[in-house]
Amino acid sequence: RDITSWPARPDLLPVLASSLSAAIIWNIFTRRMGVPTSSTHALVGGILGGVIAGGGMQYISWGSPKMIYKASGVWRVLLSLFLSPFAGFLAGLLLFKFFAFLLQSVSTRANKYLNGMEWVLVPMLAFGHGANETQKAMGVIMLALCAAGLSQGAEIPLWVRTISALAVASGILSVAPLIVRRVGGIYKQRPLHGFISQLSSASIVLFASITGGPLSTSQVVASSIVGVGSAERIKGVHWQVARDIVRAWFLTIPAVAVFAWLLHMLLFRHLNLFL
């Protein structure tokens, strides 16, 4: 809701329709291509493009970037999105250095315990991912309900929470093999690498969920793997794969914004759908 200052009235519904349509189509396309892009970036880009097409720049709450911890509006969202991968990289790099030093005299039997820790860290990461993603889903649903006059926005109904949780859970279950292989191909990992990347990713995602900072879990995981790989052997990192992923991250917001703008102009301005 920080992105737009559009009043909660019916003419917001076409804006949301074009915004979400653009984001969904982009996500389906990149998923088919096996590119691990960010659904959060797509949603932000879609809302920006839809709002600009529907009402103009004056309805964008740009906010202020003066102080990171006091940033507001679009700047707050963008700072969270683009700083979180750097946090993942640094956490992966520093934690690997620390644990590699700590475990240097430990035998390979420690791998069994590191693998066992995955049973704790993976659920932590999944919980943080779900908590972060469902907040965005609920925000969009509540915007639509308020615009349609079906809610005052004072409290999020249980059915909205339930639908959002089920949607995110079903999305996690529908694994995209190409994306899994792409992220896994950044660096050849052993138990210590997996432990560090999961620990750093879970910590950052949980912190962002608690503080209300939107981020992309896939970004954080991928950047933490790059950090872990760089800490051990920088030449072992498949930088071409990492570069392709980063390009997709930076391309998503402007590409989806333009797509949402075009959709809105075509469907709601020229064809007058739902108006």
Give the location of each predicted region:
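Multi-pass alpha-helical transmembrane bundle typical of ion/small-solute transporters
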Residues: 1-275
